[in-house]
Amino acid sequence: MVCVAPVAARVARRDTERVDECCAPRVPEGYDREFNARFARRLARQYRSDGLTPSAALVLDFAGSVGLEGASLLEIGGGIGDIQLEALKRGASHTTNVELSAAYEPEAARLLDEAGLRDRVTRMLGVDLASTPEAVEPADIVVLHRVVCCYPDYERLLGAAAGRAKRAVVFSHPPRTLFARFSAHAINAFYTLTGNPYRAYAHTPDAMIAVLSGRGLEPRYREVSGPWHVVGSVRA
């Protein structure tokens, strides 16, 4: 399973949840086109109805095991901010969301207002953490859910995330199977032909984990929900 373009139909919320909710294209312009206001509204509607997806719940469970009470959380590509909302409800002191697409902002603001939590969240738009990590303050826990499969240089991205993490990093990725790699190539070829900048990547899981290990974060948590593998690493 690899990242593909979002579709209008409602995404299943069981462990068979699709991978199409994860990925960003290479440039912000394409990102806004692919992940538009309609897509953001759908995610917000699903969250209001069903809560976190199973894979997002695993991400939050790991963060909880590290310790959310009084903690700061930084999420890269957090979209509507559903994981952050739940982290705040579990005792996190403050969260920061770094996002490339402006389409999520209206829905994120509405969700924050509904929860009465706007004053505990910072949302940064147009910041590429891998390129400008110094633009983002460090946090106790750094989250990258359904993000690394979209970024061409996972080493820079995860390295930057590790550099911002005081205590832990948790990320999710699709499996690197033969089918996943073939599908990624097929999807990317289609988008190239249609002039769409969206790209999907099936990075090697062990190589991604090694990036974090090389920066002092050792894997302590591995769980699977449908196509999503969740890895949590803590500061040694």
Task: Kindly give the residue locations of the regions a language model identified.
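Conserved class I S-adenosyl-L-methionine
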Residues: 2-67, 71-79
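Class I SAM-dependent methyltransferase SAM/SAH-binding core
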Residues: 80-128
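Short conserved loop adjoining the S-adenosyl-L-methionine
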Residues: 131-136
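A short SAM/SAH-binding and catalytic strip from SAM-dependent methyltransferases
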Residues: 141-153
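A short, conserved alpha-helix within the catalytic core of class I
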Residues: 151-161
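Conserved beta-strand signature within the Rossmann-like core of class I S-adenosyl-L-methionine
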Residues: 166-175
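Short alpha-helix
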Residues: 198-216
